[in-house]
């Protein structure tokens, strides 16, 4: 898939930066990857494991998660295939359908960048989930 379009009259979904999201709750529904850098729009509040990612997907993608993202659901990320940039000073809340399975929402095997002043918060975010540690954590 190289192109998607959405009617401006669509009452349920909206498209911005090649991302389709549900208007009612800000759930990211689909991402069409056209370039290395994927900018998730600031209207997105939730990223879960149902998001459809299509297009130029590769190990060099950069996924920029805005501070507006308040919740991630297990298995949402691109695993080790992308570099993740969290722009929020506070990490999103992790939701899992199974108690104790929240660790599946942590991109600990990806290269991850977080704001310099929030590094300790993100380290704690991982540690609070079964004592996990980041393998490739950086700041910007």
At which residue positions do the language-model features occur?
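Structural signature of tandem-repeat unit edges
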Residues: 1-19, 26, 30-48, 55-71, ...
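Short, aromatic/basic amphipathic alpha-helical patches
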Residues: 75-76, 96-105, 120-135
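Acidic surface patches and DE-rich sequence motifs
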Residues: 22-23, 128
């Amino acid at each position: 898939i190289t192109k998607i379009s959405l009617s401006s009259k669509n009452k349920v979904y909206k498209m911005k930066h090649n991302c389709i999201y549900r208007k009612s709750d800000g759930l990211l529904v689909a991402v069409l990857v056209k370039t290395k850098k994927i900018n998730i729009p600031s209207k997105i509040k939730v990223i879960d494991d149902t998001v459809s990612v299509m297009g130029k997907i590769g190990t060099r993608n950069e996924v920029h998660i805005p501070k507006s993202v308040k919740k991630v659901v297990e298995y949402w990320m691109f695993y080790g295939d992308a570099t993740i940039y969290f722009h929020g000073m506070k990490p999103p809340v992790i939701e899992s359908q199974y108690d104790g399975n929240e660790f599946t929402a942590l991109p600990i095997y990806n290269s991850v960048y977080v704001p310099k002043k929030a590094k300790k918060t993100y380290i704690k975010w991982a540690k609070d989930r079964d004592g996990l540690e980041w393998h490739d954590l950086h700041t910007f």
